[in-house]
Structures are given as C-alpha cells and as structure tokens.
Amino acid sequence: VLNKKTGEMETKPIVDLIMPSSKIEAVKEFINDNPDKKFVVFSASKKACYLAQAEFTSHGITAEVLSGDTKDSARREMVNRFVQGEFRVFIAVIEAAAEGIDGLQHATDTAIFLDRSWKTIKNKQAEDRLHRGGQKDTVLIIDVMARDSLDFGRHQRLQEKWAWIKAVLGDPGTAQKMITSGKDIAA
C-alpha cells in the first residue's frame, strides 16, 4: 500500500471478508427458526452487511442494507417498507443507523449484532433503535461471537468502557443523556 504522506510503500495486513461465514450462517439459521419474525441485523462492517444480505437472499430471506451510502430520502422509505413487511431483515452498518433512524421498533423486538463498533455510544444508540416509544415487547439483543475471539475481547472491553462511563457520570440518567447527544469518548 502506498503511504500518500511519505510516498513510500508499506506492508499492511489485509483482512478480506468472504463467505462462508459461521456467524452469518448462525444468524441465517436463527432467522429460519423464527419464520414469523422480522429482525434488525447490525455490523460495524459494510462488507459484512452486504455479505449477509447476499447469503440471506440466496436462501429466500428478504433483506435490505442501510449503510453510509444510503441517501437520506431512501432511509425513511426503507424503514417504512420494513415496517410494512416488504422484507424480513433490516441489515445496517452501526455507524449509519445509530442516529436518525426511527420506526424500527414498530416492526421488531430483536436486534442481532454480527459484531460491534469500538465506539460504545454508537452501539448503545444502535440498540436504542428498538428501545423506543411504540415498542410493545421486551427487546432481545443478540451478540454473535465465539469465545476467546476478537469479538469476545471487544465485547468485554466495551462492557468495561460502559461501566466506566456510568461511574464517571454518577448516574444512569446522565449516561442516557450522553447517549442521546451522540458524544463518545476515545477508546
């Protein structure tokens, strides 16, 4: 890879997401086991979102992806179509859906995280797409991860970070205000 600042070539490890993915397979199986439900699936990776969509649709599960590339005008339309049942799985990049998306709570009570963002607040905001006025059921949040993996370690680190935020702020109400304002602290 060419370093644009120095003009020198650098060696960087490349992680390429490919199918099959055991995490996407597990989510697909869970969705198939619950044929009368709709789901929101989150990932920090746009590529993982599109891989999940391709896998789901190839097995008859209707799914659409919301990413940072989705125009504002299309976001509201996508949510409306999901609520109306035009597709079963709303797949979203965490950073793109954490703020400014409302209405998902009218369609489902289940969010599945293929992975989490390193930004604690963005994860909480993504979860809160379902924890909103109009939600009639208990919300189920599912994290797909393997023990002793990067995902497992990230999950533990994010839990520690969230506990620290609550301790520093002194009360859960203040932490909630921080979430809704969109402020985050560095990792």
Predicted regions span which residues?
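Solvent-exposed polar/charged
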Residues: 84, 106, 132-135
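Conserved Helicase C-terminal RecA-like lobe
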Residues: 1-103, 172-187
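Short amphipathic alpha-helical segments
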Residues: 52-54, 102-106, 124-125, 155-156
